[in-house]
Amino acid sequence: QMENRSDKLSDVHWRNGWKNLWRTLGHPIETIEQQGWGDFVTTELLPFSTGQNDAQYWPNYTNHLIGGGMSYRMMREWYRAHGFRHERSWALATITAYHLLNETVEMNDKTNLRADPVADMYIFNVAGVLMFESDRVSRFFGRTLNMSDWSFQPLYDPRRGTLENQGQNYMIRLRLGRTTPWSLFYHWGNSGEFGASRHLGDG
């Protein structure tokens, strides 16, 4: 649920968003050159910028690299558990369709080329899939960091034509010791919260 976006599906300019996204992804070098290579590297790739509007690398690393990679791995394991052959292909197709739909919505009100989808689709989403293909990486995030998908349960309101309660969120929890019930806690997605959590004996 994003405050800066309408939750009415009819307010999304789907054709314009897809057209802009197709132009951007079809001409990645031209898109980056229009923004400037230096600006692209410092805002999208490397953690050099600190301004809120310039630190696009933060959601790139957290949502696309780690979150997207974990979502791919979960999807792959879901397809495998349900007896699908070629579970990697199914998972990749599903997660790619999701990412393209998300980028289309983000580009629906834009008129110029934007380098953010280039970094998302061609760098961080791909790197996330490759990273979580590793069983060792997946075990680290799943067992050591106890990473979970804490996304909302979306619903469609046909009377108002709105998509309610949507949002993709993730959580990691790092245990502070084998004998302590306390863990460092970080939750991110629609917003970010850092703190501590306590394991209760009854679950």
Question: Whereabouts are the PLM-identified features?
Answer:
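Hydrophobic alpha-helical membrane segments
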Residues: Q1-G203
